[in-house]
């Protein structure tokens, strides 16, 4: 899962949005560095990542990537799941529009930015004003996201090429999303993540 899905599942679970978004920027045990609520959000994010990566359907999705891109497929899929979520938001959350959800999330996170790592503050300087969470619905933006990640981290250069496999296998990958994500939503609502 990427930013949007983590925020979405956190909302369903009544978990800290800040903690869930911040988690990738916190190494080791966050106890003592952040409030218990934020720590719980960080830990939920980590559980979601482990859960997602070990799902048989997600392992099946990795099989749609050619050998050159299979190593980065988990990262590519995290971004792609956000694409499907953003594109189908109204079906999954008919009572709250995506722009309203994003505004709510932003209001929960931005007041706490001064207490967060500089890299996280830098992310937030782009995430909200450039409307990334809404733009995830656009497939060309997904290509741009993967290219940007590849440019920033040379070891992940294969991310840029992995977009070709998304285009080649878009429909079966979307079917896999629908096969697992609604169940994760239910687990979040039931506080089972």
Curated annotation (Swiss-Prot):
Root EC class: hydrolase
Protein name, UniProt field: Acyl carrier protein phosphodiesterase
Biological role: Converts holo-ACP to apo-ACP by hydrolytic cleavage of the phosphopantetheine prosthetic group from ACP.
Catalytic activity from the UniProt record: holo-[ACP] + H2O = apo-[ACP] + (R)-4'-phosphopantetheine + H(+)
Entry EC no(s): 3.1.4.14
Organism annotation: Yersinia enterocolitica serotype O:8 / biotype 1B (strain NCTC 13174 / 8081)
UniProt family annotation: Belongs to the AcpH family.
Gene Ontology MF, one: [acyl-carrier-protein] phosphodiesterase activity
HAMAP family cross-referenced by the UniProt entry: AcpH
Classification via InterPro entries: ACP_PD, ACP_phosphodiesterase_gpbac
One GO BP: fatty acid biosynthetic process
Keywords of this entry: Fatty acid biosynthesis, Fatty acid metabolism, Hydrolase, Lipid biosynthesis, Lipid metabolism
């Amino acid at each position: 899962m990427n930013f949007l899905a983590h925020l979405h599942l956190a909302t369903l679970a009544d978990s800290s949005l800040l903690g869930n978004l911040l988690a990738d920027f916190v190494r080791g045990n966050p106890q003592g560095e952040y409030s218990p609520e934020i720590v719980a959000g960080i830990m939920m994010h980590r559980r979601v990542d482990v859960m997602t990566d070990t799902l048989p359907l997600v392992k099946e999705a990795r099989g749609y990537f050619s050998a050159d891109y299979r190593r980065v497929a988990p990262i590519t899929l995290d971004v792609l799941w956000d694409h499907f979520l953003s594109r189908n938001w109204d079906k999954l959350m008919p009572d709250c529009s995506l722009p309203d959800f994003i505004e709510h999330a932003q209001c929960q996170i931005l007041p706490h930015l001064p207490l967060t790592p500089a890299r996280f503050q830098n992310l937030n300087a782009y995430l909200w004003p450039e409307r990334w969470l809404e733009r995830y619905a656009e497939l060309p933006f997904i290509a741009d996201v993967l290219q940007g990640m590849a440019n920033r981290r040379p070891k992940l250069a294969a991310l840029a090429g992995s977009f070709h496999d998304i285009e080649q296998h878009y429909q079966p990958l979307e079917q896999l999303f629908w096969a697992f994500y609604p169940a994760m939503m239910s687990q979040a609502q039931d506080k089972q993540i």
